[in-house]
Swiss-Prot record:
It comes from Bos taurus. The lineage of its organism: Eukaryota, Metazoa, Chordata, Craniata, Vertebrata. There is a cross-link at residue 154 (Glycyl lysine isopeptide (Lys-Gly) (interchain with G-Cter in ubiquitin)). This is Dolichyl-diphosphooligosaccharide--protein glycosyltransferase subunit 2. Keywords: Endoplasmic reticulum, Glycoprotein, Isopeptide bond, Membrane, Signal, Transmembrane, Transmembrane helix, Ubl conjugation. GO terms for cellular component: oligosaccharyltransferase complex. It comes from the Eukaryota.
């Protein structure tokens, strides 16, 4: 039987909030991303290099160029048999096209073999070896390895090392490739970690993606697991697939190559778990649907998906465990209609098994289970303060409005009691938001109170006019009482017009302007009173001290007049003039410092003037000494 204030449908909301424990993929290629990547690669050919990026990049994604025959003709017509790079692009592109065979001469073969030398760059060696492999020509792998190792010792860049890994994947398994394989561990040590989520080279996305593709291709070739931790693989994956739009063909090609390597190799296949469909279900369809794919959003239908446990976030109690998902088409489904979940948040631990290559295969899903709230036992009461009169109680049923009005004044209080229950299980609920709003029908004033439950989860709101007059500004009148109930786990938040309440405050407490009060009128201007200035001494005092300071100068002039001033040794040499002008300028600078400049500005100017004055004075005194010596 449905409770009052409820509907008969129980709704669940399942929302993936976050993975809070193990490191899981945050970026991968959705089906839309894969199509966008294909569109980035499917461009008109402008050169043999662009043809290589388009053809081989699309091939990595399991696609082909629209016109294979036309592409093959373009490769043959643009091939330069005397250029190693051109031969590399042609050989690799023709391999990715069905029925596109390119024949080369012995001279071209000799050119490629000659390029496999320690005098060539690592890139040239890589292109030559890959071209020979693409054309199906024999190669002395051990000699090529020696040339590659010698050259790599001279080129220690990340890109050169990645190209060395790519080269080694074309060499014979009989060759001793351990020295090249060991470079993988060194490259991993050079990766930069960002926020514990991303891992990449400072050289950028393209180099990082090529490293991933080259590493797994080489490891598949030699049959050894790469020295990369599972968490590092996920961090590399997050960095590579965080970018969705590509500036160049080469960048799109590198991402496609990395995606192909991570989706199919012998050691590490990251698992992507994504919820499917609408987050809301009826009780008859309480089914969690998950898409389990690789990084290219290709379904892993051969996998086995199990729920390890489902725990309540609030109580940490386990409510469901060791339950298998069922594969329906490409989607894994978990039917938990028979389990009575109370509303709230749950942590679902899901594990994907069936292949020992799977990594990031344990996923924590935050699941929100929502329900509908029912309001029961709603009582409205007026309680006499002196308790001389028995309380008057009226029961009202949601969503009806109580008939008549209720009065709260200096003689009696108004009280509201109610309970909140889960309409599906009948369990008591305590939503996060339970408010009582009182709206003045005349002035529009609103006052909101929080309704709190007691120990028995019975909500109570009591209005005592003597205690609440400040909230209401002592504004008497008829108020509409609303009950507001909300929570993230509720499917039916409630705004209920419960009753009309007449609130009367004592006349002495009512402000004369309460109804005409306008809170948006300009406030009274603030007149700031500054501190009274300190009393200064009389002018005669300051003048007296000024005269005392100037008295030595007056004495100097008096003595000059009496005994005479000897200026016979003064010359008009540049050093003499500059010295006296510099000295005067420094005295003037002191005045400017006093009136305008700060200490640091003054020191800067003083350093310039002082240097010039010092040099000029030194020159002037030297000339005076020479003059005395001559006489």
């Amino acid at each position: 039987m449905a409770l009052p204030g409820s509907s008969t449908v129980f709704l669940l909301a399942l929302t993936i909030i976050a993975s809070t424990q193990a490191l899981t993929p945050t970026h991968y290629l959705t089906k839309h991303d894969v199509e966008r990547l294909k569109a980035s690669l499917d461009r008109p050919f402008t050169s043999l290099e662009s043809a290589f990026y388009s053809i081989v990049g699309l091939s990595s994604l399991g696609a082909q160029v629209p016109d294979v025959k036309k592409a093959c003709t373009f490769i043959k017509s643009n091939l330069d048999p005397s250029n190693v790079d051109s031969l590399f692009y042609a050989a690799q592109s023709s391999q990715a096209l069905s029925g596109c065979e390119i024949s080369i001469s012995n001279e071209t073969k000799d050119l490629l073999l000659a390029a496999v030398s320690e005098d060539s760059s690592v890139a040239q060696i890589y292109h030559a070896v890959a071209a020979l492999s693409g054309f199906g020509l024999p190669l002395a792998s051990q000699e090529a390895l020696g040339a590659l190792t010698a050259r790599l010792s001279k080129e220690e860049t990340v890109l050169a090392t990645v190209q060395a890994l790519q080269t080694a994947s074309y060499l014979s398994q009989q060759a001793d490739l351990r020295s090249i394989v060991e470079e993988i561990e060194d490259l991993v040590a050079r990766l930069d970690e960002l926020g514990g989520v991303y891992l990449q080279f400072e050289e950028g996305l393209e180099t990082t993606a090529l490293f991933v593709a080259a590493t797994y291709k080489l490891m598949d070739h030699v049959g050894t697991e790469p020295s990369i931790k599972e968490d590092q693989v996920i961090q590399l994956m997050n960095a590579i697939f965080s970018k969705k739009n590509f500036e160049s063909l080469s960048e799109a090609f590198s991402v496609a190559s990395a995606a192909a390597a991570l989706s199919e190799n012998r050691y590490h296949v990251p698992v992507v778990v994504v919820p499917e469909g609408s987050p809301s279900y009826t009780q008859e369809q309480a089914i969690l649907r998950l898409q389990v794919t690789n990084v290219l959003s290709q379904p892993l239908t051969q996998a086995t998906v199990k729920l390890e446990h489902a725990k309540s976030v609030a109580s940490r109690a386990t409510v469901l465990q060791k339950t298998s998902f069922t594969l329906i088409g490409d989607v894994f489904e978990l039917n938990f209609m028979n389990v009575k979940f109370s509303s709230g948040y749950y942590d679902f631990s899901v594990k994907v098994e069936g292949d020992n290559r799977y990594i990031a295969n344990t996923v924590e899903l935050r699941v929100k289970i929502s329900t509908e709230v029912g309001i029961t036992n709603v009582d409205l009461s007026t309680v006499d303060k002196d308790q001389s009169i028995a309380p008057k109680t009226t029961r009202v049923t949601y969503p009806a409005k109580a008939k008549g009005t209720f009065i709260a004044d200096s003689h009696q209080n108004f009280a509201l009691f109610f309970q909140l229950v889960d309409v599906n299980t009948g369990a008591e609920l305590t939503p996060h938001q339970t408010f009582v709003r009182l709206h003045n029908q005349k002035t529009g004033q609103e006052v909101v109170f929080v309704a709190e439950p007691d120990s028995k989860n019975v909500y109570k709101f009591e209005l005592d006019t003597s205690e609440r007059k400040l909230e209401f500004d002592s504004a008497s009148g008829t108020y509409t009482l609303y009950l507001i109930i909300g929570d993230a786990t509720l499917k039916n938040p409630i705004l209920w017009n419960v009753a009309d309440v007449v609130i009367r405050f004592p006349e002495d407490d009512v402000p004369s302007t309460v109804l005409s009060k306008n809170i948006f009128t300009p406030k009274q201007e603030i007149q700031h009173l500054f501190r009274e200035p300190e009393k200064r001494p009389p002018t005669v005092v300051s003048n007296t001290f000024t005269a005392l300071i100037l008295s030595p100068l007056l004495l100097l002039f008096a003595l000059w007049i009496r005994i005479g001033a000897n200026v016979s040794n003064f010359t008009f040499a540049p050093s003499t003039i500059v010295f006296h002008l510099g000295h005067a300028a420094m005295l003037g600078l002191m005045y400017v410092y006093w009136t305008q400049l700060n200490m640091f500005q003054t020191l800067k100017y003083l350093a310039i003037l002082g240097s010039v004055t010092f040099l000029a004075g030194n020159r002037m005194l030297a000339q005076q000494a020479i003059k005395r010596t001559a006489h």
